[in-house]
């Protein structure tokens, strides 16, 4: 309703997530949106796992090129040493560059090269997304993960939660021993024990 009014009155509308509808609206005279660089987010999620499984430096394929030539430039991510965390950096989507964001599930070209299976054998990963009904997570983030898992030789089992209860997710982690790695996206950030208790069995 607000978007219709703002369009009729020539008032720019600003959004977040750079979902396809928000990007498409820019071509119709809306203001702009912000991309969370989901392509880089998804890559970092699985790249950190791949590096741990390979026993290589954590920065491999991120700030330092890997053996396939995958590397990120410093303007799309940041590493915070005190948090031991990588973050993708937001980017403004405007009338000048919106065409680059019309498909939010395209992998980031600088990190789109296939890893060699002999040097990086397939590993099995359990990965959950806390809310399968979330538009950004289900229509952008997970499709990107599914493209990168092939490039990184990861056999990922995806578990979608209900966004409400941890047990909806943990009940589907019945045999942790069959996986090589885990990527856990908690419903509540103080519920880590729900997962570590299962992994310690």
Language-model features: where?
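A generic structural signal for alpha->beta connector loops
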Residues: 10-11, 30, 89, 151-155
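Structured segments of extracytoplasmic/periplasmic soluble domains
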Residues: 4-5, 25, 29, 48-56, ...
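Hydrophobic alpha-helical
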Residues: 1-24, 46, 145, 182, ...
């Amino acid at each position: 309703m607000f978007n219709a009014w703002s369009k009729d009155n020539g008032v720019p509308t600003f959004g977040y997530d750079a979902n396809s509808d928000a990007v498409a609206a820019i071509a119709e005279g809306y203001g702009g949106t912000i991309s969370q660089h989901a392509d880089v987010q998804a890559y970092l999620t699985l790249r950190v796992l791949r590096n741990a499984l390979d026993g290589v430096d954590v920065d491999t394929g991120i700030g330092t090129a890997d053996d396939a030539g995958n590397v990120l430039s410093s303007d799309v991510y940041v590493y915070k040493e005190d948090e031991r965390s990588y973050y993708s950096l937001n980017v403004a989507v405007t009338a000048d560059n919106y065409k680059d964001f019309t498909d939010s599930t395209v992998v980031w070209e600088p990190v789109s090269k296939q890893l060699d299976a002999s040097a990086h054998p397939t590993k099995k990963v359990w990965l959950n997304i806390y809310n399968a009904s979330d538009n950004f997570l289900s229509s952008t983030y997970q499709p990107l993960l599914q493209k990168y898992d092939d490039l990184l030789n990861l056999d990922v089992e995806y578990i979608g939660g209900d966004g409400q209860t941890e047990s909806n997710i943990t009940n589907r982690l019945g045999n942790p021993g069959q996986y090589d790695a885990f990527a856990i996206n908690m419903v509540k950030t103080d519920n880590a024990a729900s997962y570590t208790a299962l992994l310690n069995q």
